[in-house]
Amino acid sequence: MKQYLITGGTGMVGSQLVNEIKKSDSHITILTRHDQISNDKKISYVNWAKSGWEHKVPQNIDVVINLAGATLNKRWTPEYKQTLMLSRIQSTQALYELFKSRNKAPKVLFNASATGYYPPDLFMSYTEVYKTLPFDFLSDIVYQWERFAQQFEQLGTRVVIGRFGMILSNEGGALQTMKLPYKYYIGGRLGSGQQWYSWIHINDLIQAILFLINNESASGPFNLTAPIPERQNLFGYTLARAMHKPHETWAPSLAMRLILGQMSTVVLDTQKVLPNKIQALGFQFKYSNLKMALEDLIKE
């Protein structure tokens, strides 16, 4: 039986991932910030906000999946920016210190990251061979998060970094936010509309994570995005058609930056990111184009 330790296991990605892992011969320990009782014999919860939590984590952990981190979908005040950074760095460091103190390290660590690692560009296509240093706040979060995760290599653990694109799901996240203006007939172009949206269907993301965990030749960073990214204007048009709504309005970049503040970078300063590395290992996307993904997710 394979032993999993998961942070962020009750979030949008984590909860679906847990449901998928449960189908195999496994036991899952989920680290949470509050007391929780499990009614499932395959799942146990450990409140790692409490002193002594380390002693409640099983000794024979095979796989660590680190998804913990505060949501980006809030206004980035100076205080919240600190929360965004520390929620990722401190949790990753705590995991490292846990296994450093033990004689047995996990075989593999899957650590979440984001395509915000790459600089915004309207014309460049980014693959995993591209290396960079932090250039803004979001890229600094990603860079530091990956750096802390890579410490696990010192323990002999295989480290896999998953740079998530925009996750499309019915359970929350970007898609639910993007649907709102179309619901009220005010959806349309954002800024120039030429910025890239490198997206991924939640089901493909879950399968990609498990594929990388189970593939012993997988290590280092992987772009977890669909093979065909779209520019925002076409993305919005495709979403509007799926919802049977118009795509006619325009929100200027300046207005969005004034309203959203630094958080506007998530929708305006984006990248074209391609999943070359995972495809080279043989992974096949079920939802490779946006129309197919939205038809599955939106039943209007």
Curated annotation (Swiss-Prot):
It holds the Pfam family Epimerase. Gene3D superfamilies: NAD(P)-binding Rossmann-like Domain. InterPro entries: DUF1731, Epimerase_deHydtase, NAD(P)-bd_dom_sf, SDR39U1. NCBIfam families: yfcH (TIGR01777). Belongs to the NAD(P)-dependent epimerase/dehydratase family. SDR39U1 subfamily. This is Epimerase family protein SAS0734.
